[in-house]
Amino acid sequence: EEEIRERMAAFEPEAVHIATEGPIGIATRRICLEWKLPFTTSYHTKFPEYVSARFPVPVQVGYAYMKWFHKPSGRLMVATPTLRDELVKHGFRNVSPWTRGVDTELFRPDLKAIFPADWPRPIWLNVGRVAVEKNIEAFVELDLPGTKVVVGDGPAKADLEARYPDVKFTGAMFGEDLARAFSDADVFVFPSWTDTFGLVILEAMATGTPVAAYPAHGPIDIIPGSGAGAIDDDLRTACMACLNLDRQAVRAYAEGFSWRASAEEFVRNLQPQPEAEKVKFWRRLRRLARLRRRAAAA
């Protein structure tokens, strides 16, 4: 915590945003409250559901912690209207939208194929951390024609690989190779119920690959009416519906999620200090830091 305190004092931020509810986020939150600095936060992970999936911890306990953490935030940023509505029902305040963007230059259609030519088509792809909360087993156990591929690594990979020998587990991919994997697939399958958005959905769409998913947070805000994918309580039904979609239309839809729009929305949501207060505050803090250093050296 002392290192965070020193870095903030040296950097003199115009605004503070806390992107994690973990140890670094807790320390930064405590410093901001101590210094009476306004700050914003964001809700990237359905933490209560993740913890409940891994350990015998009731979801309500996780939500109690998250409400405590985000309560002093000037603005809690969330990726989708559906998540905003759910958090408001749980008693969260100051909830504001912050949509996501995708790198449409890296993730683009018609990249060089990366999967072996002898893998039967269609190729059904999942990308992400291979962990129980991602619900990947719902994908790999589907009865689908062609080849199922999982790109990524994680604690559940060895177990799934042993139990589903017909599925291709490639390990992690990055950069151009990852973009090629998205582009080479026929359908991207997103089986998670616990993500708050699912950036991989946009990455797949940017390459022209349609997305099949459950009607969960993220997919339910991105896919319906887009012509870029399908959602259904029966994941196989959603998968098969994607085979007939126009890949050019999928790409065109993804182009509406730009990094510029996402960045501008983020900046609008920040809670900077008024200029006059900021100058006085950091001047006072620098003076206190000098006094502390002198006392420590004495």
Locate the predicted segments by residue.
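A charged, aromatic-enriched C-terminal amphipathic alpha-helix characteristic of glycosyltransferases
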Residues: K112-I114, L243-R287
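Conserved donor-binding/catalytic core segment of Leloir-type glycosyltransferases
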Residues: F115-V149
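Nucleotide-sugar donor phosphate/pyrophosphate-binding loop at the beta->alpha transition
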Residues: P38-T40, E49-W68, V78
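Short hydrophobic beta-strand element within catalytic cores of glycosyltransferases
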Residues: P210-A213
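Short alpha-helical donor nucleotide-sugar binding micro-motif in glycosyltransferases
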Residues: M8, R180-A185, F266
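Nucleotide-activated donor-binding/catalytic signature segment of Leloir-type glycosyltransferases, i.e.
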Residues: K157-E176
